UniProtKB/Swiss-Prot annotation:
InterPro entries: aa-tRNA-synth_I_CS, Arg-tRNA-ligase, Arg-tRNA-synth_N, Arg-tRNA-synth_N_sf, ArgRS_core, DALR_anticod-bd, Rossmann-like_a/b/a_fold, tRNAsynth_Ia_anticodon-bd. GO terms for biological process: arginyl-tRNA aminoacylation. This is Arginine--tRNA ligase. It comes from the Bacteria.
């Protein structure tokens, strides 16, 4: 937690100032050897020409422990200074937590553009999209919680060949509803229930207006527009049910007029064989990339580059772009990052999180996802099978780059083998305790430290919360949050099982601990967008 580090840094800097020493102080987590540790004495060895242990002793003697809420300081070989915070600091910390002030304070905040899900508007969202939605939305929540500005964006791929396939599939299914049995879908079309659903929506809206109408270019374009509109409405509806909403939906078609202007901003393009190329091999790519083919058409790379240029240069003043790619697109990452450098952006402008496959199992059977064959497990199906809470939790409970097997039968069970339930159960238990207590929380009356091993373990887990949030805001590893909440819930349950709280001599202190735990569990569940039930 930044404020904890700041406190110890100030204590060290104050001591160094008294010794007329000017040096940058770096702290590390001490884990089992205190709250924080510093190697400043070893850093100063050469400058002062003294033994690090002697230097450490000089520094420690100048530290005002009471002022900086330090309980004790230990010096260990070869010269580390380990700091243990006073119990007054923990009372202060827990009181802040209990009032929903989690002391999140990054040294610097940024504006992020997160583009996630971005499924083609050609069918229902499936479980793979659900993983991207849960991870992207949770990361956006955490970044915002850490005081960053976040733009949530969905890129609507409405300009490719897949939209032509969608339009014709919609046309055929619509004609079949009207009784035309002579028309059949091509093998490479979309054969799923989603197209039948879209056709019913289309038929409800237009009745027999297009009955037996030839599939002309004009009709094709109409079915393209309507197909995308219907699919996108369904996508938005399912995402809302999944507690995911976006700030922007950007059409790929809207980017096309901006491609030529955007490509002119690239530094290292050249023409060869009638095509326009981007020189990427000089920056580590295995080959240069074609932007405009010799027939004048764009490669898929060109609109993608233009779109990223637009995102970076719009009025939001975005510092960083975060994309979510399927594992099958991992080779695309490097060339995108190289290309963005050619626009003059910094190397770390684009961050890409890889989303591995999700497999769903029920009764020992694996479902194979293929939208065109109609065997995909949709987001709607997933929610119906295990509920929004379980889906949101288990889709973010592992690293995004690891393959994920979801056992529906196990996840749906409400017991202590279910991580989401463990957290919700602990939260409900905190509510039960706080409903029973009659004490008025006045932290000034707390005199004794948290010295019981179950109390101290819970305090140590709680204090990690803001540190964890700050860490996730930097490394984007959101699975650490769900794992942390499980650890917190288990620590609380151990504390509860081994402590008399209500009517105990130390009830005031323990109620503060319960209240802080309740607040952290609630905030963690809110970030995951998993419900926090008052009772179970």
């Amino acid at each position: 937690m930044y404020i904890m580090k700041l406190l110890i840094k100030e204590a060290l800097e104050d001591a160094l100032l008294k010794l007329n020493i000017s040096r940058k102080v770096i702290l590390t987590d001490a884990k089992d050897f205190g709250d924080f540790s510093s190697n400043i004495a070893m850093v100063l060895q050469k400058d002062l020409g003294k033994n690090p242990l002697e230097i450490a002793q000089m520094i420690v003697e100048k530290i005002n422990k009471e002022k900086f809420l330090i309980e004790k300081i230990e010096i260990v070989k070869p010269g580390f200074i380990n700091f243990f915070l006073d119990h007054k600091f923990y009372v202060y910390l827990l009181e802040k937590f209990s009032k929903n002030d989690f002391l999140i304070e990054l040294e610097k905040t940024y504006t992020y553009n997160l583009e996630y899900v971005s499924a083609n508007p050609t069918g229902f969202l499936h479980i793979g999209h659900a993983r991207g939605a849960a991870i992207g939305d949770t990361l956006a929540n955490i970044l915002e919680f850490a005081n960053n500005k976040v733009i949530r964006e969905y890129y609507v791929n409405d300009a490719g060949n897949q939209i032509s396939i969608l339009a014709y599939a919609l046309y055929i299914r619509y004609q079949q509803i009207l009784g035309n049995k002579t028309l059949n879908l091509p093998e490479d079309s979309y054969h799923g229930e989603d197209i039948k659903y879209f056709a019913k929506i289309f038929h409800k809206k237009y009745q027999e207006k297009f009955k037996n109408v030839d599939y002309s270019l004009e009709v094709e374009n109409f079915f393209k527009d309507e197909g995308v509109k219907i699919a996108l409405e369904k996508i938005k509806l399912d995402l809302k049910t999944f507690r995911v909403e976006f700030d922007l939906y950007t059409s790929e078609k809207s980017i096309y007029p901006l491609i030529e202007k955007s490509l002119k901003k690239l530094k290292n393009t050249y023409e060869q064989d009638g095509a326009l190329w981007l020189k990427t091999t000089d920056y580590g790519d295995d080959k240069d990339r074609v932007l405009i083919k010799n027939d004048g058409t764009y490669t898929y790379f060109a609109p993608d580059l233009a779109y990223h240029y637009v995102k970076k240069t719009r009025s939001e003043n975005v510092d960083y772009l975060i994309d979510f790619f399927g594992a099958d697109h991992i080779g695309y990452v490097k060339r995108m990052q190289i290309a963005l450098e050619q626009f003059g952006f910094s190397k770390d402008t684009l961050n890409v999180l890889i989303l591995e496959m999700v497999k769903l199992r029920k009764n020992g059977t694996e479902f194979v996802m293929s939208k065109r064959k109609g065997t995909a497990i949709s987001l709607e199906d997933l929610i119906e099978l295990i509920g929004v809470d379980n889906a949101r939790f288990f889709l973010v409970d592992h690293s995004s780059s690891s393959k994920l097997d979801l056992e529906i039968d196990l996840i749906a069970e409400k017991n202590l083998s279910n991580g989401a339930f463990i957290i919700q159960y602990a939260y409900a238990r905190t509510n039960s305790i706080l409903e029973k207590t009659k004490v008025t929380l006045d932290v000034k009356l707390i005199r004794k430290p948290f010295d019981d091993k179950f109390e101290m373990k819970l305090v140590n887990v709680l204090k990690e919360f803001p540190i964890l949030i700050e860490k996730i805001a930097e490394n984007f590893k959101i699975h650490l949050l769900s794992q942390y909440l499980i650890t917190l819930a288990k620590s609380f349950n151990s504390f509860y099982s081994n402590s008399k709280i209500i009517d105990s001599e130390e009830e005031l202190k323990l109620i503060l601990l319960v209240k802080a735990t309740q607040a952290v569990l609630k905030k963690g569940l809110d970030l995951l967008k998993v419900e926090a039930p008052e009772r179970i």
